[in-house]
Design a protein with these regions (language model features):
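Short alpha-helix
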Residues: 155-169
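Conserved Class I S-adenosyl-L-methionine
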Residues: 172-226
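A conserved beta-strand element that flanks and buttresses the S-adenosyl-L-methionine
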Residues: 97
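Class I SAM-dependent methyltransferase SAM/SAH-binding core
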Residues: 35, 41-85
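Short catalytic micro-motifs in class I SAM-dependent methyltransferases
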Residues: 100-101
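A short glycine-rich, Lys/Arg-flanked "PGG" loop and its adjoining helix->strand segment in the class I
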Residues: 109-121
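Conserved class I S-adenosyl-L-methionine
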Residues: 1-32, 43-47, 64-67, 71, 126-148, ...
Length: 226
């Protein structure tokens, strides 16, 4: 996804994301140290920053990090790193988050395991991502379309897969929600600078416009060892 598209979507969703973060993760004490794994251009980090002591954003793409640093408040810092092999010690954060990232990863289960590892005992793990269909054919067609639109796309996870990753790491699900989000495909293609030829290829398998997607939101707790 281009930096321009990320920043445009970030601006559009900023207030909604801020409200949702406060509802799902609040109330905050103001002393929390938070990880934003796969931070992109900083959408989640900036939503959390007013409520916590520190946010550390991690991403592999330097152009995203550069754009994020230009807009960062004083309690937010960004470093280059891999969300499936995080450069932090066990229990480094009070809250570890991964927002709209899992579908970009070859091994999303490794990212969830890493989030669990770097979160302190009784800390929280926050996941959010577009969800895949339980119907194999629909899932295949949607992933095919998403890869044409964004080559970094790997696979949309069904709700059951996300819950399975949480269970596999002995995380206790505190709350979850599924919301519907309308997608303006033409505007996204405009912001991405897609050529006319590429647009034609993307429109072929695209869902009928306008279309909606489901987004899953999950907050879990890391329990103490028995």
């Amino acid at each position: 996804m281009s930096v321009a598209l990320r920043l445009a979507l970030q601006e559009e969703r900023a207030e909604e994301l801020s409200q949702r973060v406060r509802r799902l993760l609040g109330p905050f004490t103001g002393t929390e140290s938070v990880l934003d794994a796969g931070c992109g251009t900083g959408a989640l980090a900036f939503a959390l920053a007013p409520h916590v002591a520190e946010v550390v954003g991690v991403d592999l793409r330097a152009e995203y990090l550069d754009a994020a640093r230009e807009r960062a408040p004083g309690n937010v810092r960004f470093i280059e790193g891999d969300v499936t092999a995080l450069p932090f010690e066990y229990g480094s954060f009070d809250i570890s988050a991964c927002h709209r990232v899992l579908h970009h990863l070859h091994r999303p289960e490794l990212a969830v395991s890493e989030l669990a590892r770097v979160t302190r005992i009784d800390g929280r793990i926050f996941l959010a991502d577009q969800l895949g269909s339980v119907d194999p054919l629909r899932s295949y067609e949607m992933d095919r379309f998403e890869r044409l639109r964004d080559p970094s796309h790997q696979r949309l996870l069904p709700d059951a897969d996300v819950r399975g990753y949480l269970d596999a790491n002995d995380l206790v699900l505190l709350t979850s929600d599924v919301t519907r989000e309308r997608v303006d495909l033409e505007r996204r293609l405009d912001l991405s600078g897609v050529s006319d030829d590429e647009r034609a290829k993307i429109r072929g398998p695209a869902p009928a416009a306008p279309y909606e997607v489901e987004v899953g939101w999950y907050v879990s707790r890391k329990p103490g060892r028995g």
